[in-house]
Amino acid sequence: NKFLADRELKLICPVCGNETKGDQCDCGHVPTKEELAGSICVECGNKTIVKDNKNLYIALSKLQPQIEEYVSLHKNNWRKNAQNETDKYLKQGLRDRAVTRDLNWGVEIPVEGYENKRMYVWIEAVLGYVTATMKYCEENNLDWRQWWKESDNNKMYMVHGKDNITFHSLIFPGLLLALEDNYKLPDMIVSTEYLNFNDQKFSKSKGIGMTILDAIEELNVDTLRLHLIKNGPERKDTNFTIEDYKATHNEITNKLGNFVNRTLKYKGIETIPEGNMDTTFKDKIEKMYTNISEQVEKLEFREAVLLIIGFLDEANKYYDE
């Protein structure tokens, strides 16, 4: 005898055939109200029935021309999956999205007649970026407007998984545009594919994978950070295994650790002295620095790490020769 939020529903996705919650499938499909009509309650397993309900909506359909203009100006700097997913929804025509839910927890709605509703999490979550900036600036005697009002002095990067693309490329810009208060919109949409664990999707309920807290307790943090970037799912899903992590640890230990150790040990050096660097090798280092910086600016973090590891091979070769 209650209205259920989309996350409290489950159904079979008509696109990929997998079971999904009612808000969005892992394949990216957002169930329509017709598809939700045959859904099941996650809590009790009973089939749901459709009744009229009253919610507040953001009129994305009215904002589509402004959103399209924003996307056209920025999308060339986005990851390819973000470009494709965003273009797909714009081509279909943006649908108005409900911004309220029937829940007893969450951000309250300060609108008469909606006091028992709560804000949809992906509305308050993205607006939380602005709120967090305001809070930080308030505590540090700074002006939050220098980041969130139009400025040529900063760039805004939205980093997330591919299942959250539209919240950052369409809904968040739509919310800011609707405020009509000259807010800065995201410059870069940095959306990754999925990272799997031993060829399976991470799942807390099924006990597949490890939490980040477990990982930093059991593994070397520096190696873990390097491995996750080196093996990052930038263009396709990738797989995490302990064996691959160990291989990265051994690779960087051998190529960097041994190079530094044998160089200092060979000369009995405890501190690095002043000296003259081989001009040719210095030029290689400067070129490498430029190349890596360019890759980072293009959001090609994996390629940047591979350039660093590749240069370690050159450094070891230089030492041997």
What spans do the regions from the language model cover?
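Alpha-helix initiation/capping motif
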Residues: L4-R7, K21, T32-K33, R79, ...
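Polar/charged alpha-helical tracts
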Residues: D6, A37, E138-E139, Q146, ...
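Short, charge-rich amphipathic segments
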Residues: D6-L9, P14, N18-D23, K184-Y194, ...
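Surface-exposed loop-to-helix/strand elements on domain peripheries
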Residues: K236-H249, K287-Y289, E314, Y318-E321
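Amphipathic alpha-helices that form helix-helix packing interfaces
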Residues: F259, T263-Y266, I285-M288, I292, ...
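Acidic, turn-prone loop/beta-hairpin segments
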Residues: T271-S293, Y318-E321
